[in-house]
Curated annotation (Swiss-Prot):
SUPFAM superfamilies associated with the record: Zn-binding ribosomal proteins (SSF57829)
Pfam families: Ribosomal_L33
Disulfide bonds: none
Similarity remark: Belongs to the bacterial ribosomal protein bL33 family.
HAMAP family according to UniProt: Ribosomal_bL33
PROSITE patterns referenced in this protein's UniProt entry, alphabetically: RIBOSOMAL_L33
Matching InterPro entries: Ribosomal_bL33, Ribosomal_bL33_CS, Ribosomal_bL33_sf, Ribosomal_zn-bd
An annotated GO cellular component: cytosolic large ribosomal subunit
Protein name in the entry: Large ribosomal subunit protein bL33
Keywords, comma-separated and alphabetical: Ribonucleoprotein, Ribosomal protein
GO molecular function list: structural constituent of ribosome
Organism expressing this protein natively: Deinococcus geothermalis (strain DSM 11300 / CIP 105573 / AG-3a)
Amino acid sequence: MAKEGPRIIVKMESTAGTGFYYTTTKNRRNTQAKLELRKYDPVAKKHVVFKEKKV
């Protein structure tokens, strides 16, 4: 069974189109908007924006 609570697992997918993604958790109560983070994409070999997608 899934864990109950405010934290959910989200997939952060690269906007560079490489298909690379990170997984992280976010608190649904504090952060209701979709996440956008600038992280390193090892396939593109540079920092790009990662956007939240459904797992």
